[in-house]
Amino acid sequence: MSEKLQAIELEKSYNPKEFEERIYSFWEANKCFSPIKKKNTKNTFTVVIPPPNVTGVLHVGHALDETLQDVIVRYHRMKGDETLWIPGTDHAGIATQSVVEKKLKAEGKNRRDLGREAFIEKVWEVKNEHHSIITKQLRKMGVSVDWDRERFTLDEGLSQAVREVFVSLYEQGLIYQGNYLVNWCPSCGTAISDDEVEHEDRKGGMYHIYYKLADGAVLQNEAGEKIQEIEIATTRPETLLGDTAIAVHPEDPRYASIIGKEVILPLANRKIPVIADSYVDKEFGTGVVKITPAHDPNDWEVGKRHNLPVLNILNPDGTLNDAVPEKYRGLSTEKARKAVIEDLEELGLFKNEEKIKHAVGCCYRCHTSIEPYVSKQWFVKMQPLAQKALDAWKKGDVVFYPQKWENTYAHWMNNIRDWCISRQLWWGHRIPVWYCADCGKTIVSRTDITECPHCKSKNIKQDEDVLDTWFSSWLWPFSTLGWPEKTEDLARFFPTSALVTGHDIIFFWVARMIMASLQFTGKAPFKDIFIHGLVRDKQGRKMSKSLGNGIDPLVAIEEFGADAMKFTLTFMCGSQSQDFLIDMESFKLGSKFANKVWNASRYILGNLAGRTIVPVGRDGSLNSLKELDRWIYHELNEAAQTVRSSLDSYRYNEAAQKVYEFFWNNFCDWYVEGTKLSFKYGDEKEKDRAASVLLAVLEESLRLLHPFLAFVTEEIYSKLPGNCAEGALPRAKILMTSDYPEEKKERIDEAASIRFRTLQEIVRNIRALRAECGIDPQLKLKVSLYIEKNSPAEAARENSEIIEMLSGLSGLDFIDSLKEKPASSIGVVGAGFEAFLITGDSIDIDQLKKRFEKELEKNEQNASKIDSKLKNENFVKNAPPEVIEGEKEKHAEFLRRIEKLKGYLEGMR
């Protein structure tokens, strides 16, 4: 049944603040975020959100993560897949505990003043307070997560999963405890894993020190002189107090005579052996190194090979302990370094210091220098788990987008080290291990115990440490769905479908999730892994608090709206994990596009009064439509196919660029403008037909755009007439849960596409020619058009009014021969046509011709110079690749300009 339309008013200006919050509440109220099982739905699509730290504040990197997930989730939901996106937060052991400890410090207290139980209560208070901040931020971003399934890594169910995994790995012999060298953060007071150590370039010194040979031993130097000391270079002179040997290469003839002898350790005055080990580089420095097994990972390995004593000289807070001479006890490593150098200098045992810049291992949380430190910790044997993860990748069970990350993944898996999982914190999953003081047994249990199962003693104590935060995060894809219980959600939605994350946590999190999932479910946790680049500032720097160059997503949303921010991030996110540069100005791209969608929709809806929707194309046939209509349906069809293909392979930027190009360039600039002729000159039937097609294409365009501009498209969609879909059929009630556009073969019309592309070329050429000639845009001139027979440009004869209107002309006529070229005109040549702009007295054609000739000569000279440069073997051999590429681009641009100028001059002949 036909529907008489009323004018539909949208607000004059696009104002996202007016509707974004309201639209989000509307989606929540209508349960749009829950999995929807449509008819004939067989596929599921599941994503778990990378859980942000519960006490953190979301930054633009999080915004990128959530945006890309939101786009792909909305797309699959509209495709008809039963779609679930699980939100949640991470308890973030070190980070969260640090927040609370800082607050206590400001009050002159520490956690031990409160006691464990009271301290943890405090942390829960802070967690609850910060959690609401994060969820508010996520809602502001418009993420379509299922809030009913929100998880937290310390939830009861997830805690049960952690216990199950720990005990199971222990029972399989894959978890063990021992005294090992670990990465110790003196500020956080805990061990951290290798992957949590970041390396920063810092200024330092290379200190050259003498060690005297003991018991009268001598060494002959290169000059043939007998000497009694050996020169050693080190960046950590304070650790010499923990040396238990010095080492030389076994095949170094310079030191063969002293292997097995001893030296006197400076300042400590104890004897240590000279050992031979192939770890030593004969060519580096003097070819002698100090060995401190307790404070260097390489020395630790050397020490194990030679059964050297392990002498720990540090306290947990990073100060020197009682194992060193009294004067150095209690000093920080920096103060001890200074004191040691001064004392060596006084003894004549210090040669010199070289200023250097070197990579220093730092805590990823507080950036304190990490100390290699021997302590009793819990570890996971990773190699057996890594092998399964490698095999799964080789079989294609997990696929990386882009593929280049597969090599990184394989390298890490092949070179994996055991994972230190214990942390000297109070906040987190407490290690499920108890020690019996009476019988000395260690008990590992899935449930809390109150007595020793071996001797029934009540004198038991639980391990004080908690598990590394990542120990709960690596279970995230299946623990969030109810594992180890056999839940309906686990059966329906696991394995999950895709993981979207940055390349900075491939090993921290991605690889570990694959290992855990294969070990405990027998399946890979997800099929697809999209690794995106990192967001950097316009100078290419990583965004950080210290640089003050970060972007707060909420500030961007306040200024531009969530759609604008998210569209910009999607548009700029390359498919090859390239880092990209951004600032607040960048979001204007998304803002302008959202504005364009709003204004185009406002124009269409505001000019429909009195029109009747007619069932054009209901039978699937578009033959009765005008060429302009058939062309836009062809372009819409091609856009839907391209966007689907791009999103199916995580080429986000290509998808965003395609919807931008289709809506702005094809729909707004050409189609909407072209339909104005029908409304201006057509009869009532023609106007109804034009309105019906225009509305149908707008309705489908909003569905195409929705994953990228969720709020504004939903707001506009809600205003559309009820029967505005193609064929005057009813539209969906809610855009978010409607069907995504798909390719329809009956819409393919290559002939219309080719013919209309030629019309566009004619219009663009006329516009460009006007601009080149400096003609006032308001001045309407005439054009004479010559069309080659049987060329696509013949479409111009049937669409002369469109060309005339879009080119800003006062008239358009056709000539049958180039001999009929009008006087006082300038021509421009295209594929199958030549257009002559009749300028009359508006410009001096002779002067313009001279200008073009002069510019042509200059461009030919420039092109020739670059051509010679690129043919110069020395230049190509020595110039940086980016310089060569830049020259090639300039050369191509000169050639394009030359071609255009020749065309203009040809048209002036």
Curated annotation (Swiss-Prot):
SUPFAM superfamilies: Anticodon-binding domain of a subclass of class I aminoacyl-tRNA synthetases, Nucleotidylyl transferase, tRNA-binding arm, ValRS/IleRS/LeuRS editing domain
The keyword Transmembrane helix is annotated on this UniProt entry: no
Residues engaged in binding ATP: K545
Motif 'KMSKS' region positions after renumbering to this chain: 542-546
Ranges in coiled-coil conformation: 843-902
Compartments, as annotated in UniProt: Cytoplasm
Residues spanning the membrane: none
Record GO cellular component, one term: cytosol
GO BP term, example: valyl-tRNA aminoacylation
Catalyzed reactions: tRNA(Val) + L-valine + ATP = L-valyl-tRNA(Val) + AMP + diphosphate
Any one Pfam family match given in the protein's UniProt record, by short name: Anticodon_1
Broadest EC class assigned to this enzyme: ligase
Domain of life: Bacteria
CDD domains for the chain: Anticodon_Ia_Val, ValRS_core
Gene Ontology molecular function terms on file: aminoacyl-tRNA deacylase activity; ATP binding; valine-tRNA ligase activity
Known EC number: 6.1.1.9
Keywords: Aminoacyl-tRNA synthetase, ATP-binding, Coiled coil, Cytoplasm, Ligase, Nucleotide-binding, Protein biosynthesis
Motif ('HIGH' region): 52-62
Classification via Gene3D superfamilies: HUPs, Isoleucyl-tRNA Synthetase, Domain 1, Valyl-tRNA synthetase, C-terminal domain, Valyl/Leucyl/Isoleucyl-tRNA synthetase, editing domain
Alphabetical list of PROSITE patterns matching this protein: AA_TRNA_LIGASE_I
Complex and partners: Monomer.
Recorded domain comment: ValRS has two distinct active sites: one for aminoacylation and one for editing. The misactivated threonine is translocated from the active site to the editing site. The C-terminal coiled-coil domain is crucial for aminoacylation activity.
Known role: Catalyzes the attachment of valine to tRNA(Val). As ValRS can inadvertently accommodate and process structurally similar amino acids such as threonine, to avoid such errors, it has a 'posttransfer' editing activity that hydrolyzes mischarged Thr-tRNA(Val) in a tRNA-dependent manner.
Family statement drawn from the similarity comment of this UniProt entry: Belongs to the class-I aminoacyl-tRNA synthetase family. ValS type 1 subfamily.
Protein name, UniProt field: Valine--tRNA ligase
Lineage of the species this protein comes from: Bacteria, Pseudomonadati, Spirochaetota, Spirochaetia, Spirochaetales
